[in-house]
Amino acid sequence: MSRTRFFQLLRYFHVVNNQDLPDANSNREKLFKICPVLSALQSSLKTLPPEEYQAVDEQIIPFKGRSSLKQYVRNKPHNWGYKSFMRAGASGTMHDFQIYVGKNTCSDRGLGLSGDIVLALTETLPEKQHFKVFADSLFSSIPLAIALKERGIEFCGTIRIDRMGKCPLKTEVELRKTGCGSCD
């Protein structure tokens, strides 16, 4: 298919009826034009049987156009684009995802945005079946690990020093003085 033909077809492709659009002043979703496609994709992904080992991570969907949802994340292969959070199995199969739309990306559960995203993405996992969820330091916190443990989901992740709460640990300088292989 030629480029011209593709853009002609794309011009008439609409997921939502433009006559039924909510007012620009009303409190509408930022992704309202593609929401039916996203929800259909999410529902089909949730029918896949979950794997025992799951990973939660962020991904940038490359995009160079203009959009209020476009994010910049340094140290990624594609710095500019739409930020999405996803849960994938050990085989690499995606089981659930959410597109970042700001503070209202998911409901507030008191764990901060990153913790709330992990809880939202693991909602569809059956409870008390000892699924193992892995995440990097962006998502990890002690309250999140406790919340997942209450649901019977095991969690593994690196916790940042500023998310340790009132845990009395040695500073990095003190650990360096004690030598290699020492722990707190």
Where are these regions (language model features)?
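N-terminal initiation segments
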Residues: M1-E154, T158-R163
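An anionic, glycine-rich sequence signature occurring as long contiguous blocks
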Residues: G165-D184
